[in-house]
């Protein structure tokens, strides 16, 4: 019989890389055409005027202007105003 317990393996010791999600350009700040405004998982923020959605739900500017956040009927919208 062994006098010491054999070394076991662990199921821990892993972690995923952070995805750097969140707001990249805040309200009343300027943004260029194609500039990323928000990186998100799902449509937490919806696109407003002059804003489009990427395939990973990233919101980006369709033209140059200032970012504007607004809430309409409990929905958050992001727009770009010239």
Swiss-Prot record:
GO terms for molecular function: structural constituent of ribosome. It comes from the Eukaryota. One of its GO terms (biological process) is translation. One of its GO terms (cellular component) is chloroplast. Its main location: plastid. PROSITE patterns: RIBOSOMAL_L27 (PS00831). It holds the Pfam family Ribosomal_L27. It is found in: Plastid, Chloroplast. The keyword Methyltransferase does not apply. Signal peptide: none annotated. Residues 1-22 are annotated as: Disordered. Keywords: Chloroplast, Plastid, Ribonucleoprotein, Ribosomal protein. NCBIfam families: L27. HAMAP family: Ribosomal_bL27 (MF_00539). Belongs to the bacterial ribosomal protein bL27 family. This is Large ribosomal subunit protein bL27c. The gene is rpl27.
């Amino acid at each position: 019989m062994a006098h010491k317990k054999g070394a076991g393996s662990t199921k821990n010791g892993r972690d995923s890389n952070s995805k750097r999600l969140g707001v990249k350009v805040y309200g009343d700040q300027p943004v260029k055409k194609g500039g990323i405004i928000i990186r998100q998982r799902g449509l937490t923020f919806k696109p407003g005027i002059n804003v489009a959605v990427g395939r990973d739900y990233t919101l980006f500017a369709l033209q140059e202007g200032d970012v504007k956040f607004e809430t309409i009927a409990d929905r958050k919208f992001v727009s770009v105003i010239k």
